[in-house]
Design a protein with these regions (language model features):
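Ferredoxin-reductase
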Residues: 14-109, 163-165, 190-193
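Histidine-anchored nucleotide/phosphate-binding helix
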Residues: 140-150
Length: 261
């Protein structure tokens, strides 16, 4: 059985925020769906944690193994409410997520290190954006969208979010509210396995395919993709080979499964 780990090229840029180890305290736990938990973490008060929207942290477990989760909060939120939010999906049999869904309590202290990852918005570009997420791959996209709104970045952005069932799109209402305030945001929810009782009338099928259906040419776009490796890999190969997306205009964080030790 598996928990989730994020794989990403490290930032080598000199301006990248410094990586630090720190204790974090569980501030609040909230179930967003039957198998996704929002975990609010409080950071050490004396310790300014700098990161870029889209980056992730790693928990260091007692046995030394690590679990990586994208930060769903944009950095500017720290100024008013120090702390970060993570979206953790339950992988039954996974040591860490079983703990999160079974035993984790408010005030518990965890060890973390970060920030890591190169999944942050390239702000020197004004190209229109496609954000592609599957499942909890939405977490860093939430941070990117919040950051864009805060910074007044008006680049057109099309968000495609895929889940098996409608309830897997756990921040659907939040996105619709944001879109009302961000006229440049287009939101396309996609469900791959809708059941009759879901009464789903929206787009169906695979989320990476919905982008292929909507865009004949991605040569002038940038794509940011996060989620299951099959989604990210299918998107990368098909957009570059069939939709003229330049290879260097595809940015991704893929969740890969790591067997629990």
């Amino acid at each position: 059985h598996t928990d989730v780990v994020l794989e990403s090229r490290q930032v080598t840029d000199a301006s990248a925020p410094p990586i630090k180890k720190m204790p974090v305290r569980v501030g609040a736990l909230e179930k967003l769906s039957h198998d996704v938990m929002r975990v609010q973490l409080q950071l050490p008060a004396n310790n300014v944690f700098k990161y870029l929207a889209g980056q992730y942290i790693e928990f260091i477990l007692r046995d030394g193994s690590r679990r990586a989760y994208s930060i769903a909060t944009a950095p500017h939120v720290q100024e008013t409410a120090p702390g970060i939010e993570l979206h953790i999906r339950h992988m039954p049999g996974g040591l860490f997520t079983d703990h999160v869904f079974g035993a984790l309590k408010e005030k518990e202290i965890l060890r973390a290190e970060g920030p890591f990852g190169s999944f942050f918005l390239r702000e020197d570009s004004d190209k229109p954006l496609v954000f592609l997420a599957s499942g909890t791959g939405f977490a860093p996209i939430q941070a990117l969208l919040t950051h864009m709104q805060h910074q007044g970045i008006t680049r057109p952005v099309s968000l495609y979010w895929g889940g098996r069932r409608p309830e897997d799109l756990y921040s659907d209402a939040w996105i619709k509210e944001l879109a009302a305030r961000m006229p440049q945001l287009t939101y396309v929810p996609v469900v791959s396995d809708a059941q009759p009782e879901d009464n789903w009338t929206g787009r169906t099928g695979y989320v990476h395919q919905a982008v292929l259906d909507d865009f004949a040419d991605l040569s002038g776009h940038e794509v940011y993709a996060c989620g299951a490796p099959i989604v990210v890999d299918s998107a990368r190969s098909s957009y570059i080979s069939q939709r003229m997306l330049p290879e260097e205009a595809f940015f991704a964080d893929a969740f890969t499964s790591a067997a629990d030790k």
